[in-house]
Regions:
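Catalytic cores of Mg2+-dependent Asp-rich isoprenoid enzymes
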Residues: 1-163, 169, 173-287
Length: 287
């Protein structure tokens, strides 16, 4: 599995808000290295038929290699396509290791939650997960751009958390069948929707009115956070600022499509088409 040489090869890891040709050329290598680190960890946590314990063991070994690379030591020979590139980026750009470690923590949490049949009790618990599964990506990118302002970091967190939540609502029908439940359980109880009903709705392609109201409540709460975070586009100059405009508008467009489908996310999964990209581009121009 060769490592990507530029951000143009980034196509899989949905939590990674980075595009292709808009990425500043001098940052493509470190961004690709960070991406490949996250992508490989995601695969360890999610792909194949390994047991939960084997996945956790693999991520523990992966973390050990990260710590070795952060100290200038040789990593194991298991993932040379990851750590040979990442080690260079760590030294050259002084990457904050805690953000990379947070991503691994989130992957481990996903494995344990799925293994134990657990969901998220409250919105606060779900958002805490997002602080490790999504927000580190934005903070790493800001670090590469040399932006450390607290307000900018807060805006970045809002964008990344919003993107993660949008991905959850978009992928409900897929995640539920994989034993992953991201709608907070207290919200489910409030709307009178059980986990068994969610599973049955996906399997039968029939969604109750209460389930629709539940999903609508989640999706309609997300845009405000994204719009607040979008102030970041005015703090980042050049290509990176334009790239971020497309990222923000892409997330908001998915929310538009969720609404257009009457929040029937247990039946449908919205996807962007050519016209959507035209709309995204137009909206990005006017941010």
């Amino acid at each position: 599995m060769p490592a990507p040489q530029s951000a143009q090869e980034i196509t899989h890891y949905e939590n990674f808000p980075v595009a292709s040709w808009l990425c500043p050329p001098h940052l493509r290598a470190p961004i690709a290295a960070i991406y490949w680190f996250a992508r490989t960890a995601d695969d360890l946590a999610d792909e194949g038929d390994a047991s939960p314990q084997q996945r956790l063991d693999d991520l523990a070994a992966y973390r050990a290699d990260l710590m070795a690379a952060s100290k200038g030591q040789s990593a194991s020979t298991r993932w040379p396509q990851v750590f040979s590139y990442l080690a260079v980026a760590i030294v050259k750009f002084s990457l904050p290791i805690n953000y990379l470690d947070d991503l691994l923590s989130a992957f481990e949490q996903d494995i344990r939650k799925t293994r134990d049949g657990q969901g998220y009790q409250t919105e606060a618990e779900l958002h805490d997960y997002c602080t490790r599964s999504a927000n580190p990506v934005g903070r790493l990118l800001l670090h590469l751009y040399g932006i450390t302002d607290a307000k900018a970091l807060s805006y970045s967190d809002d964008i990344c958390t919003s993107l993660q939540l949008i991905n959850f609502w978009q992928d409900l029908s897929q995640d539920i069948l994989r034993g992953r439940f991201y709608i907070p359980e207290d919200e489910c109880a409030q709307f009178g929707v059980s986990r068994a009903e969610l599973i049955n709705s996906v399997q039968t392609k029939q969604q109750s009115q209460n389930a629709t109201k539940l999903i609508a409540a989640q999706a309609t709460n997300t845009p405000a956070r994204m719009i607040n975070g979008s102030k970041l586009v005015h703090l980042i100059p050049g290509r990176a600022g334009w790239e971020l405009r497309f990222v923000v508008q892409g997330g908001l467009r998915i929310l538009d499509k969720i609404k257009a489908l009457n929040f029937q996310m247990l039946i449908h999964r919205p996807k962007l088409n050519t016209w959507d990209y035209v709309v995204i581009g137009w909206r990005a121009l006017w941010m």
